[in-house]
Regions:
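Hydrophobic h-region of N-terminal signal peptides that target proteins for export
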Residues: 10-19
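Non-catalytic cap/lid and distal C-terminal segments of serine-dependent acyl enzymes
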Residues: 20-187
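Sec-dependent signal peptide recognition
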Residues: 2-10
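Basic/polar N-terminal segments that are highly enriched at the extreme N-terminus
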Residues: 1, 18-21
Length: 187
C-alpha cells in the first residue's frame, strides 16, 4: 500500500513540476507607447517544442488590481494544476499569456497619458503573435480575467471585436466614471 501511495505522490509531484516549468514568468516586453517595460508570463502547449510548424490559439488571462501575472499560478487558481486537468481532457493546446495590467483596468486613462488598451491591441498582441506560433486571428484569440481583469476581459473584446472571439469575465469589478477618476493611478 505504501509503495502505491509513494508512486502516486511521485507521479503527482512530477506532473506539477512539469507544468510549473512551463509557466514562464518575467518575460520581457517593452512598450514604446507607454515608455516602459511590462513583464508577462506565458505557458506553451506541452508539444510546442516537438514541432516547429503547429500554430496555436491564444488565451490572454488578465489579473486583478494589486496582482501580477504570477498570481494566476501562485495565489488564485493554481494554473499549473488546472493545466494538467485540461491536458488530461485533451483541452490544453493553447498558448496562455498573462500580461501585466497594473491598475489600468486594461483601458486607456481618461486623460490619454496611459493608453493601456491601445498598447495592448497595437503593440502587445502583435508582439505575442510575432514571438510565438499563434493562430493570429480573432477566431483563435480570447480573454479570461478576474476582478479588474474581468473588466479587461469584457471591455477588450467589446471595444475590439475584430481582435477577440471570446470573453470570460470572472467576478468582474465595475467602476463608475467617478470611481475611476478618484482611484490613484499605479504603474
Amino acid at each position: 500500500m505504501n509503495k502505491v501511495l509513494y508512486t502516486f505522490a511521485f507521479c503527482l509531484l512530477s506532473l506539477t513540476a512539469f507544468a510549473q516549468e512551463r509557466f514562464t514568468s518575467n518575460q520581457p516586453f517593452h512598450s514604446e507607447m507607454l515608455g516602459m517595460d511590462l513583464p508577462y508570463a506565458v505557458v506553451l502547449p506541452a508539444d510546442y517544442d516537438e514541432t516547429s510548424e503547429t500554430r496555436y490559439p491564444v488565451i490572454y488571462l488578465t489579473h486583478g488590481i494589486g496582482c501580477t501575472p504570477d498570481d494566476w499560478n501562485d495565489k488564485y487558481i493554481r494554473f499549473e494544476e488546472t493545466l494538467i486537468q485540461l491536458e488530461q481532457e485533451g483541452l490544453g493546446d493553447f498558448i496562455y499569456v498573462f500580461p501585466t495590467g497594473f491598475s489600468s483596468y486594461y483601458s486607456n486613462t481618461y486623460d490619454g497619458k496611459f493608453p493601456y488598451m491601445d498598447m495592448f491591441i497595437q503593440e502587445f498582441i502583435p508582439f505575442i503573435d510575432g514571438k510565438y506560433r499563434t493562430i493570429a486571428d480573432r477566431d483563435h484569440r480570447a480573454t479570461i480575467g478576474f476582478s479588474m481583469g474581468g473588466f479587461g476581459a469584457m471591455v477588450l473584446p467589446l471595444k475590439h471585436p475584430e481582435t477577440f472571439c471570446f470573453s470570460a469575465p470572472l467576478s468582474m469589478s465595475f467602476r463608475t466614471d467617478e470611481m475611476y477618476l478618484e482611484e490613484p493611478l499605479k504603474w
